[in-house]
Each structure stands twice: as C-alpha cells, then as structure tokens.
C-alpha cells in the first residue's frame, strides 16, 4: 500500500530525512513517533507535496510514485495534511466541507458519492 525507500529530504541546505524507509501493507496501522526535529513533519510534508524540499528516493502509494504526481492528485488519493484545529470559515458548514472532501476522493476512486444521510 505504501512503500518508502531511501527517502531523503533537504531544505535550505539542511538534510532532514536521510535514506528513510517504511513499508505499510493494507490493514496495517503505524505511528510515526520521535523527538522534536527528528523529521516527522518533514515526512508528512514531503508525502503530501509541500514545495521547498529537495527530495531523493521513492514513495509509492498503491503503486503510484507520489513524488511524481501533483499535489491535487495526491489529495485525491487521500494523501494530504489537515489541521488538528482548523480555522472556521464563515458560511461553511464543517459537515458539508468534510462530505465534499470525502466525495471528491470517492469520485476519484470510482465509487458512488455519499448523500447527507449516508455520510452521517
């Protein structure tokens, strides 16, 4: 499902990730843990497509090299960052926002979109 091999990431001449590797098979759950500055956020940023990093290595998700596809395509595959405490957007209902996001991913995967009752 997710295979990362020899992933290195550098920003502003500082190497953060050095030959990182990880394999997550379908059904497995993993936690990325470590002290401040160990590269957890950098890993998430690189996988989700944040710009500004010099990247070497490979990161395959469901057979697709994430590092070769645009941010929008990564998000459609479900690879994106979300804020733990998102800001409120006036006039935007949180449930509707989440349903729209989920349905965009479902549509990309060829699945039927959920109506409001199915979503809840």
What are these regions (language model features)?
Residues 48-49:
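Helix-to-loop junction immediately C-terminal to a conserved catalytic motif
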Residues 33-35:
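The feature captures the beta-strand-to-loop junction immediately N-terminal to the Walker
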Residues 31, 75-84:
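ABC nucleotide-binding domain signature
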Residues 2-4, 17-19:
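Conserved structural motif at the start of ABC-family nucleotide-binding domains
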Residues 14-15, 73:
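Short coil-to-beta microelement around the adenine-binding A-loop and adjacent beta1/P-loop entry
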Residues 87-120:
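ABC-family P-loop ATPase nucleotide-binding domains
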Residues 58-74:
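ABC ATPase NBD Q-loop/coupling interface
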């Amino acid at each position: 499902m997710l295979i990362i091999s020899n992933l290195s990431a550098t920003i502003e001449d500082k190497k953060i990730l050095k030959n990182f590797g990880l394999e997550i098979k379908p059904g497995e759950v993993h936690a990325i843990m470590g002290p401040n500055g160990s590269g957890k956020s950098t890993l998430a940023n690189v996988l989700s497509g944040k710009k500004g990093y010099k990247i070497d290595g490979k990161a395959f998700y469901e057979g697709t090299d994430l590092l070769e596809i645009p941010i929008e395509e990564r998000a459609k595959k479900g690879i994106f960052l979300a804020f733990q405490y998102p800001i409120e957007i006036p006039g935007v209902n949180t449930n509707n926002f989440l349903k729209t996001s989920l349905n965009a991913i479902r549509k990309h995967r060829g699945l039927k979109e959920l109506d409001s009752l199915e979503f809840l």
